[in-house]
């Protein structure tokens, strides 16, 4: 099967470039400008996904497109129109080009933020009405709605926070916290959050590629087990061969401490729940190969093996 991939230089894209050829797929990487690939097992084609008519040749003979490119959530100061142009319009343009080229399926790597804000009071499923709260989430949801109007078999994977070797952002901050030698007073935080191992995302993509039925829908995707922040820290520290060293402390006092220090946003990230139910994807055959606690332990071990000094320099 010949796959076309966008976003090959991003965190998720780099994993896909490396792993998909190992699993027997032929890979054609779509690049905006010439650049070196991390592997010689993929061919590269230069093109601009914002100009779909220029992409027809690049998508010739492709069986499916995996669209991973886009503006990331954590980019501060980006106007909403930029999110719409890059995350919405370019996605729809690429899907149109894929349809003209005869691709059988279009896989859009979306985000759980197309479904909700940074936290949610209920377990999320695809049956709930989406209510994104920022420009990033709205741009992803608008892209899905645009795909629904096209005559192509599309799938949107609304991924929870993805983690794996090389991850940045909020997960990198949590890694730094776990790397600290200090005991942490996080045991009183009972909120749970769903995460997604990059290996489990790859398995989800393979499931969608192998499915014969027409899909044309979004799927929420996350590791089946949601963890508290204390459980995440404990799993990471076990990956370093250390005792978890997380103790109970009243959540209200912890909140007062954070707010007194002007760290309101940091506390919200630690204390807010966001739990999703990936049962719909599992019903079409997805079996995530990696448990969250195992994945987090491996994440820390990989970071330590790769660069023990750099692990200490992850910036909060």
Segment roles from a protein language model:
Residues 3-23:
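N-terminal Rossmann NAD(P)H-binding glycine-rich loop of SDR-like oxidoreductase domains
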Residues 164, 186-192, 219-226, 235-241, ...:
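Glycine-rich Rossmann NAD(P)(H)-binding loop
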Residues 198, 231-234, 258-288, 298:
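Conserved C-terminal active-site "lid" loop/helix of NAD(P)H-dependent oxidoreductases
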Residues 85, 118-163, 167, 184-187:
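Catalytic helix-loop patch of NAD(P)-dependent Rossmann-fold dehydrogenases
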Residues 36, 46-92, 97, 114-115:
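NAD(P)H-binding glycine-rich loop region in Rossmannoid oxidoreductase-like domains
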Residues 138, 167-173, 187-210, 216-220:
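Substrate-positioning beta->alpha
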Residues 207-265, 297-301, 306-316:
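Mid/C-terminal beta-alpha module of Rossmann-like enzyme folds, strongest
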Residues 92-135:
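Conserved Rossmann-fold NAD(P)-dependent oxidoreductase catalytic core, especially the SDR/UDP-sugar
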